[in-house]
Amino acid sequence: YQTLMLLNRGGKSSERECEICHSVENLVSYHDQKVCDICRGLYQFSKEIAHDHFIITENEGLPIGPNACLKGVAFEKLSQEAFSRVYVKNDYKAGTVKATHVFVGDYHCYEIYNYAALSKNENGLGIKRLAVVRLDVDDLGAAFMAGFSQQGNGQYSTLSRSATFSRSMSLFFKVYINQFASDKKLSIIYAGGDDVFAIGSWQDIIAFTVELRENFIKWTNGKLTLSAGIGLFADKTPIRLMAHQTGELEEAAKGNEKDSISLFSSDYTFKFDRFIT
């Protein structure tokens, strides 16, 4: 009885739940909020994400497992850290530290909510909006399952070819994508496998989407296509809401026999070739 009364006693939710994820955990104070260890770790790790080196430690950083935390450090400070594993991001050089190399699409130009103001021209004219793009590859699952089956009576349907195919897709969306974004005012939130999610000034998001699609057609020799949705939002719109609504535009593009783009509304859905020309 006493346990039930204790669990159901009154009080603010922040006294019992993390104010960010609402999990019931042991809470700590961070920036005037009561948060769990995971959310505090995400707060701190978000400041370290720009570093090129990431290490696994036992008790400092973002918790990722039993006695394992992920922490971002600068290369010159590696010698000051006690770690069990090192990861290097987007770097081909072997260097002097034994590390696992990982590649991610992580181009970043400005803070996300600055992009709306950057959409205006040099005279301060134009609509103050940011844009979000979500896109993915059409029928990629079918390509993996049956892409080689019609050639040579299926003799090319091998694990090695599927692995090469997968590696080539990852190379495009994790490495080359940063080059397509490098001169544009946008941030890549996620890029990997066959999905892309990016936020930026609306002019540059459109240009980025078109450039990405054109290069993808070249990369796949015209055998695969993309479908994309681009949403237009005020700068105070929550990212979760922008992602959801843009995902609906992406689905509208796929519903247009794919290889299409939905621009700002499902009413404006076009085949990519028609949109570009």
Spell out what each predicted region is.
Residues 1-277:
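Regulatory and interdomain segments flanking nucleotide-handling catalytic cores
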